[in-house]
Amino acid sequence: MVKEYSVSGTALTGEDLEARDVTIIVTDGIITAVEEEKNVPEQWICPAFFNAHTHLADTVAMDIPCTGGLEELVAPPNGLKHKILRQTPKNDLVLAMRDTIAEMINSGTAGFADFREGGSEGVSALQQAAASLPIHPVILGREGGENIADGAGISSARDVKDSAEIAGRMRRAGKIVGFHAGERDFEDIDLALDAAPDFLVHCTHATDRQIRRIADEGIPVVLCCRSNFQLQVTFGSSNPPIKKMQAAGVQILVGTDNVMFIQPDMMHEISFIHTAYGVPAQDILYSATCGFPPAGLSHAIKQGN
């Protein structure tokens, strides 16, 4: 049975978020028409968010008081988060992640890319958590989990000695590869770039030369600015060097990172970036709603999406 509905208002349409008065017709989850209208309700229609970097398993650690920086809280294998994950039963993990996914949906997020710890069992837990929910998960595993996931999410080329081999294997399998890079310093960015990733996360301390290389190689960068401040890897608007990235032509995406201390609310994330870094509202809104190019996902309001 065909399911069709329509919604009218002022919509931010296409790849450039052009504001148009339209009626949008959706058939079986696909936009089949975007029709110009003269009289529409006074409401705005915005493309859904895509959260381009999450660690949803951290949900189980949300209520635990924690202080410290990157190494103490989230660095593998002995950061607080990893100790908690190892002690958490799988069923508890699934239920916690499912609750967080529901919150993401309620705040306008239609997809996410998760770096999933815990090998194949960890990937399986997130697959179960997202099952039947109206959201598109891109799951990137590690420690063998990449073999049953959408690809690999590598913590750092500095820490994972066979990261280049993993990246090559993923490419041959037609899967996605993402790297944490440049979160605490610039030293692992070139190592990650040498592996020809589909995207990088953070690049908080990217140098001018590295920014130029990232732009030349057409590699998107996912910013997680609230997390950078929380983990004390930055203390000002120069890091990550967003304006330099924009000037160089780097494609910028937005993620919220670790759920244990950052709510996966994309509106809060882009509001922070707009305010703290002075990024124009339209630019950062586009970064948060364009979808996930590494997986070929577009969230633009246009026919066929």
Model-derived regions: residue spans:
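Active-site gating loops and adjacent loop-to-helix segments of metal-dependent hydrolytic enzymes
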Residues: 59-94, 190-191, 217-223, 273-279
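Divalent metal-binding segments
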Residues: 72-122, 161
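Active-site microenvironment of metallo-dependent hydrolases
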Residues: 1-22, 26-30, 35-36, 98-105, ...
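Hydrophobic beta-strand scaffold residues
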Residues: 111, 137, 177, 220-221, ...
